[in-house]
């Protein structure tokens, strides 16, 4: 592999993933148009850095992210990478202008329809395979079943569980930003992994209360996404966003205090954000989205940076992170 990135086992699946997984939402045009060349350069930088796991979804640019990742990986040996996508949204022809829908730009003329039924999931996976130019998906995640938990459990999960039994897919999981509902799924389904977005970070460690212990108890791997809380933990400047909205003054002040402590230790706040998440024994890998090669390079540099042992105890002493997170 091309850097100091480690490969780690994904729970009980037999799969191994790079400790940093490429998150495919930004190259799907999230919040701004991303050109083909820019997206390809981001993927090339990830591969060159040693990233060998890629996470995408039909939702990301209504298929644009899947198509771009599929085109990039088509020339690579299939055994050399792990591919994750999601189910729960079917893509259908859209009658009107779709630019900016759900925050994505430069997208195909398609719309999303929620569908967590068995038949809907099977059809969605077939569509994803075509867009990804592959004959198999390694990890299938039920995507954002916030208001559809029971249907997702009875329909989507049952379908994915059968595909796993038939060895069509290697791992089954759920991906969303509600830690409590993820725990609900962990306690009711035989999951291999969960993808938790934004709920285990320097600013929001709420997943540590219930979800992460539940995953440890059941041998469920945790993939942590949204670890910069949409930007504030990469650069806590005035106007920074927290969970895709302008950061409240109190959170911005806290992030700036975290940055000041990090500076005393010679550590960029982005590096601290990554290392904090990976310190938890339940967390297998981080999912980091990037829209260009420079963002990939920066993320990898932060992940491979040395972080002094005294940083996190000092953050806890200052009341900026929970005491339990440094034990």
Which residue stretches match the model-derived regions?
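N-terminal binding-site loop/beta-alpha segment at the start of enzyme catalytic domains
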Residues: 1-93
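Acidic (Asp/Glu)-rich catalytic clusters
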Residues: 12, 72-78, 130-133, 185-189
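Active-site groove signature of glycoside hydrolases
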Residues: 129-148
């Amino acid at each position: 592999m091309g850097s100091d990135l480690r490969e780690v086992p994904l729970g009980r699946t037999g799969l191994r993933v790079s400790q940093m997984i490429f998150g495919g939402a930004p190259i799907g045009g999230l919040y701004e148009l991303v050109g083909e060349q820019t997206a390809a350069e981001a993927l090339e930088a990830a591969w060159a850095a040693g990233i060998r796991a890629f996470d995408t979804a039909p939702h990301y640019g209504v298929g644009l992210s899947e198509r771009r990742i599929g085109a990039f990986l088509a020339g690579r040996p299939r055994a050399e990478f792990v591919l994750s996508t999601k189910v729960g949204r079917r893509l259908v022809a859209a009658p009107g202008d779709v630019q900016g829908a759900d925050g994505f730009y430069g997208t195909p003329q398609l719309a999303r329809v929620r569908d967590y039924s068995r038949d809907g999931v099977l059809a969605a996976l077939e569509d994803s395979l075509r867009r990804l130019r592959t004959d198999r998906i390694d990890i299938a995640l039920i995507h954002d079943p916030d208001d559809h938990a029971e249907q997702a459990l009875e329909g989507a999960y049952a379908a994915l569980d059968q595909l796993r039994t038939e060895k069509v897919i290697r791992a089954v999981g759920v991906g969303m930003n509600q830690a409590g509902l993820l725990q609900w799924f962990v306690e009711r389904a035989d999951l291999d992994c969960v993808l938790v977005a934004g709920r285990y970070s320097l600013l929001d460690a709420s997943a540590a209360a219930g979800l992460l212990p539940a995953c440890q108890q059941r041998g469920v791997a945790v993939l942590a996404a949204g670890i910069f809380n949409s930007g504030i933990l990469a650069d806590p400047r005035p106007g920074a966003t927290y969970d895709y909205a302008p950061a409240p003054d109190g959170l911005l002040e806290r992030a700036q205090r975290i940055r000041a402590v990090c500076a005393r230790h010679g550590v960029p706040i982005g590096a601290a954000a990554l290392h904090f998440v990976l310190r938890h024994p339940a967390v297998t890998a981080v999912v980091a989205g990037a829209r260009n090669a420079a963002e990939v390079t920066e993320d990898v540099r932060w992940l491979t940076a040395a972080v002094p042992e005294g940083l996190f105890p000092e953050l806890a002493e200052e009341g900026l992170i929970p005491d339990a997170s440094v034990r």
